[in-house]
């Protein structure tokens, strides 16, 4: 029993000794799991790193492939390097230009390649810069670059001027093209683009310059011809007019007599009326010439008084009043003498004709309104307007100008009343003995 008792503890002790073995075996199972996890983590990290490095390698591959020719060296041929290269400083090698940075287009002995151009604002890039070609830039839509100012793009015009039509649209190299409707002359304030010059066919009938030159030449010739005719007529009329005036006034065409009478006061006011009367279709000069023809053998140039009155009776009846010249009786200043009579004209000229009369004399509507505002009363209005007329025209204001204006307005009665009043007041008289006939 003791042995069993001893064996029992021994067995239990044996179990105690052997017990940790299995526990240690069970506890050793997590040990291998930790390295596996680490292996998985490390493998994942390595995969990520390899993938990223692969991407970086792919991104850098193209520049490296493009840069590879840049570093390529070759020997110059007869001292020159091919396009896309420049010569080294020692002159032994040709060094490739850098893609996208500089270039060379021809065989050269440059120490450095040319820098690539960068497109400015307002331009678009058509093709990038390479080692053998510069960047190609073009103006944006709606703008163009002139040949004489390639540094900037200008806006195209939106339409053609009046009288012209559009025949060409806006391009990056030229503005819109306009031509005249009639002549087809090209109208452009700009220098024509190179494309327009190249595409012009040699079979064009006439250039715009030649057409415009022909038009200008014809216009100038027509203007010169018109001016020459006008000058000739004016000179001829000045020479003939004194003789016509002398014949119509009974002076026998003596220009000296006519000139002396034209220099007298108020004569220049009737020149226009005499010209109008001369140009009227009375056929008086022809009649005079017919009567004078039989008298040529006797050497008499003047008609007898009876014949002259008989032939000129219709014209004399119409122009008898116009030939009577009013002059101051006291040989005073004509304008000042006329001014002294203005106060009585309000009773002689109808009220409705006051403003039309002043307009005929040259006063503006504004001047008439000012004169009416300055007048002291209703009856003083015409006097104030006449004073303003005299102040405006000065020495050109004459009694004959006033009478002619009344005649033009159809106020013949008022004209006759003023003429009678000037004579009866003793301030004016008729020149050359006409006063007696007028007063009778």
UniProtKB/Swiss-Prot annotation:
CDD domains: Death_TRAILR_DR4_DR5, TNFRSF10. Residues 339-422 form the Death domain. GO terms for cellular component: cell surface; plasma membrane. Disulfide bonds join 81-94, 97-113, 116-129, 119-137, 139-153, 156-170, 160-178. GO terms for molecular function: signaling receptor activity; TRAIL binding; TRAIL receptor activity. It is a single-pass type I membrane protein. TAPE repeats lie at residues 192-206. The keyword Membrane applies. GO terms for biological process: activation of NF-kappaB-inducing kinase activity; apoptotic process; cell surface receptor signaling pathway; cellular response to mechanical stimulus; defense response to tumor cell; extrinsic apoptotic signaling pathway via death domain receptors; intrinsic apoptotic signaling pathway in response to endoplasmic reticulum stress; positive regulation of apoptotic process. Pfam families: Death (PF00531), TNFR_c6 (PF00020). Residues 60-71 have a biased composition (Low complexity). Monomer. Can interact with TRADD and RIPK1. Interacts with HCMV protein UL141; this interaction prevents TNFRSF10B cell surface expression. Two TNFRSF10B monomers interact with a UL141 homodimer. Three TNFRSF10B molecules interact with TNFSF10 homotrimer. In the absence of stimulation, interacts with BIRC2, DDX3X and GSK3B. The interaction with BIRC2 and DDX3X is further enhanced upon receptor stimulation and accompanied by DDX3X and BIRC2 cleavage. This is Tumor necrosis factor receptor superfamily member 10B.
